[in-house]
Amino acid sequence: MKKKFRIAVLPGDGIGPEIMREAYKILNILEKNFSLPLEIREFSVGGIAIDREGIALPEETLRGCENSDAILFGSVGGKKWDYLPIESRPERASLLPLRKHFNLFSNLRPAKLYSDLKNLSPLRSNIVRNGFDILCVRELTGGIYFGKPKGRSKNENGEYSFDTEIYYDFEIKRIAHLAFELASSRRCKVCSIDKSNVLASSILWREIVEEVSKNYPNIILSHLYIDNACMQIIKNPSQFDVLLCSNIFGDIISDECAMITGSIGMLPSASLNSKKFGLYEPAGGSAPDIEGKNIANPIAQILSLSMLIRHSMNLNEIADKIDSSVYRALKAGYRTLDISDGKNYIKTNEMGDIIAKFLINGK
């Protein structure tokens, strides 16, 4: 008997449980129709965990994740918990500790504009007529967000604050290797984003990326300063394949790429460590304003599951089938509210049913 692949499911808050229910439909098909040996266990996280147990990341949840091969995450947070100190709120007290505990140093954020949804993009039609497919590879555990010293103080000149951008060569090497490896199965292009005309950390970044690139002669490497990159993405997004970014630059660029697709409800993400253990989640938030209305778009959650199948289970063919099922649903004209004309749209559960049907029929 094949060893079961263990998935910890953390639905979370807001629309998290609603869109996770649609991902469960896909998981059930993978078990029954594709004969994947899966062991799925669900745990509480975020605000709902605070309400139940007084903490956003309960010990049982952390241990459950430790005993799993991957984490499928929903969303956390909401105004209900804004009274708490920032460090105790659902977002800060669950996601960040999980990333740190499992050393999830890389964040993968695909931004794809489907040809049938070109009208959603805020960019002109002549810019997006061919669509685009960008993968932002962001270093997640180093850089200015974690560098020390940082703080706030006063002197004779007044009050001041400071942060420190620190990158070690090994941190740059491992994220660069991942970007090149991912590019080799895409269009074989990596564009590294830095600010090496100003920042010492970016000078090292560019040097290390150039060094790593010598191991991948089939990959075309280019470099852009962060300010120029932001402009080029607006001007011609289809020129890009894989974007390799430091923590802060990746934070900026990935959100820009997300917005020009027209709907963040379509976008998945993955955070991986060196052993391909990953946390997979939609790029959007918990959207408490539409919680319980059955109008949330479940596609980002379903595509996050597809990324789990691809990167942690290494089952590219099955992941391709899930992606294709999503595309076929869109091609057939099915739309949730966020990607519709506001009049003709289907509910959250209906979109999940339709994608599941395409997956079964396309097996």
From Swiss-Prot:
GO terms for cellular component: cytosol. Its cofactor is Mg(2+); Mn(2+). It catalyses: (2R,3S)-3-isopropylmalate + NAD(+) = 4-methyl-2-oxopentanoate + CO2 + NADH. Transmembrane segments: none annotated. Keywords: Amino-acid biosynthesis, Branched-chain amino acid biosynthesis, Cytoplasm, Leucine biosynthesis, Magnesium, Manganese, Metal-binding, NAD, Oxidoreductase, Plasmid. GO terms for biological process: L-leucine biosynthetic process. PROSITE patterns: IDH_IMDH. Substrate binds at residues 99, 109, 138, 227. The record marks 145, 195 as: Important for catalysis. SMART domains: Iso_dh. The keyword Amino-acid biosynthesis applies. Its EC number is 1.1.1.85. This is 3-isopropylmalate dehydrogenase. The gene is leuB.
